[in-house]
């Protein structure tokens, strides 16, 4: 029996990487997958799901007015049967679109894997996440860590100086320059340690970085 899965996490937990790996696993076995990504996410090329480690794949960019159930039916008429539907940045789904995902699972018998944030920078649920938490068959937490080493469960919005931002619109598209994943303690303190990873080259002569 097909199920609706919600993979949730804080920022930078590798959600898109896991999504792309899941799609690859299906396609490696000759199965078709259908990928959706919200059009509102303008960080990368339009209609593309990108991971921080460099993986990418084309996807259908949807708007809040799109019916994902109808789109999946229409796309399936143009190709062979889909074995899985995957949704990136699922927190941006509307209540109606989450219901449409349940229809894809229940009426079309296609597994749906949705990946997204659980809460916004205020610690409040996104609409899409709220109804995925309520209606998904399986909930899977993808873990990442705070700068202190504890598990990060909060998404802190920061300004250009790395200071915590506590007011503003719920949706502000951004990456590491705008958000930091932290534990609850450092979120409440408004403390974010903003670091920029340095690429180290491996020296084959010394067998070390």
Curated annotation (Swiss-Prot):
EC number: 2.7.1.21
Gene Ontology biological-process annotations: DNA biosynthetic process; thymidine metabolic process
Predominant cellular place of this UniProt entry's protein: cytoplasm
Keyword tags: ATP-binding, Cytoplasm, DNA synthesis, Kinase, Metal-binding, Nucleotide-binding, Transferase, Zinc
UniProt xrefs under PANTHER family: THYMIDINE KINASE, THYMIDINE KINASE, CYTOSOLIC
UniProt family annotation: Belongs to the thymidine kinase family.
UniProt-recorded name of the protein: Thymidine kinase
Organism: Legionella pneumophila subsp. pneumophila (strain Philadelphia 1 / ATCC 33152 / DSM 7513)
Origin organism lineage: Bacteria, Pseudomonadati, Pseudomonadota, Gammaproteobacteria, Legionellales
């Amino acid at each position: 029996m097909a199920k609706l899965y919600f993979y949730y996490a804080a920022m930078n937990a590798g959600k898109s990487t896991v999504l792309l790996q899941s799609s690859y696993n299906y396609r490696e076995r000759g199965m078709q997958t259908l990928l959706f990504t919200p059009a509102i996410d303008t960080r990368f090329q339009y209609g593309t799901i990108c991971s921080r480690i460099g993986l990418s794949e084309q996807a259908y960019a949807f708007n809040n007015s799109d019916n994902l159930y109808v789109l999946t039916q229409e796309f399936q008429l143009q190709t062979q049967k889909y074995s899985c539907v995957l949704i990136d940045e699922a927190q941006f789904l509307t209540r109606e679109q989450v219901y449409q995902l349940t229809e894809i699972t229940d009426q079309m018998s296609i597994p749906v894997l949705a990946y997204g944030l659980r809460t916004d920078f205020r610690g409040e649920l996104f609409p899409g996440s709220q109804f995925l938490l309520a209606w998904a068959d399986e909930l899977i937490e993808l873990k990442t860590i705070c700068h202190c080493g504890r598990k990060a469960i909060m998404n802190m919005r920061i300004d250009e100086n790395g200071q915590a931002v506590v007011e503003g619109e719920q949706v502000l598209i951004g990456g590491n320059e705008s958000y930091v994943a932290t534990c609850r303690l450092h979120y409440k303190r408004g403390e974010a340690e903003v670091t920029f990873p340095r690429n180290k080259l491996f020296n084959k002569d010394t067998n070390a970085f």
